[in-house]
């Protein structure tokens, strides 16, 4: 959840975000979107460009969505294109640069009501969860002593190099800071959040996860604070953190919300409150190939698509939720 102070003229002025946030979600049946598995006929493909699907993907979803796109292409014959980046950066490519994909899949579903709805998108799907972990390699300083109970001591020691993503661009960046605040309360260690933040100097704050992974694997970093799916996709070692702080448990939403961080942007400051990690996806209003985008998203939410996500350590929701009044009929028809 986010609130902002000041004006950001680079983002759309949203007048109905609260309306979208409080729309009743639509539950999608597990037998969702069999249409996604059927190849469109040639006339339909020619009419709406269904043979091409362009997808913007949050960095932590890059590998799972690539696998899903490949599976979709094999089933339908579609030409698939993927562009990866930090979630907030991807959203701004749409709102500021006018570069509009057929599907956008982001690491924080709140980016939709906060940035994209209602101008760039009119609905979105909540489709997956994740958890925060501490990833490392055998060469990491203190790796032989690292455990789930002392990770914060190891990371806050002098000389240990910890990387994290830029909270102005990537949800995982502000989630790392929220993790630190929750850890301070959970472990009862005064000033722990400040100490953990100090373990990452500005030079080790990067715009996307791929840079952090490369630095970690090259030995330029000792640890990165990121998602479990990213660690698994890159075959990194990682420490699983307590559910009380790893932002994975929907039942702990109220407890997570007790933590908050303020992030200074170009023209304003945004406050993010802790919340369970939930991924979101949509077909933007100005998509070039909207029907093809809907077919791919239907596939991604189907049992076959969910299986691909789970194979890459993404906790796909068995019953995804659709939020908004303008859900495409092909998706709406699948709800219970």
Predicted regions and their residues:
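Bacterial N-terminal signal peptides
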Residues: 27-36
């Amino acid at each position: 959840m986010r609130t902002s102070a000041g004006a950001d003229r680079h983002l759309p002025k949203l007048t109905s975000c609260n309306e979208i946030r409080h729309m009743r979600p639509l539950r999608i049946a597990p037998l969702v979107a069999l249409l996604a598995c059927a190849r469109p006929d040639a006339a339909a493909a020619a009419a709406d460009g269904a043979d091409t699907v362009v997808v913007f993907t949050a960095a932590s979803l890059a590998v799972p969505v690539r696998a899903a796109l490949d599976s979709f292409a094999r089933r339908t014959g579609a030409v698939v294109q993927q562009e990866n980046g930090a979630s907030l950066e991807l959203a701004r490519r749409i709102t500021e640069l006018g570069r509009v994909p057929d599907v956008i899949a982001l690491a924080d579903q709140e980016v939709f009501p906060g940035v994209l709805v209602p101008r760039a998108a009119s609905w979105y799907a909540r489709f997956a969860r994740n958890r925060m972990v501490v990833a490392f390699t055998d060469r990491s300083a203190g790796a032989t002593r690292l455990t789930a109970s002392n990770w914060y001591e190891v990371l806050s020691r002098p000389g240990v190099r910890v990387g994290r993503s830029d909270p102005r661009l990537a949800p995982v960046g502000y989630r790392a800071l929220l993790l630190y605040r929750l850890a301070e309360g959970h472990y009862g260690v005064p000033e722990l959040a400040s100490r953990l933040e100090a373990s990452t100097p500005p030079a080790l704050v990067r715009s996307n996860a791929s840079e952090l992974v490369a630095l970690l694997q090259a030995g330029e970093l000792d640890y990165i604070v990121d998602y479990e799916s990213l660690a698994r996709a890159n075959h990194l070692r990682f420490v699983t953190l307590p559910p009380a702080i790893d932002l994975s448990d929907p039942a702990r939403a109220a407890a997570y919300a007790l933590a908050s961080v303020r992030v200074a942007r170009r023209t304003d400051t945004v406050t993010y409150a802790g919340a369970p990690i939930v991924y979101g996806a949509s077909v933007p209003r100005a998509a070039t190939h909207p029907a093809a985008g809907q077919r791919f998203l239907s596939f991604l939410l189907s049992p076959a698509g969910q299986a691909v996500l789970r194979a890459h350590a993404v906790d796909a929701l068995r019953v995804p939720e659709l939020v908004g009044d303008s859900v495409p009929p092909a998706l709406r028809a699948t709800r219970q």
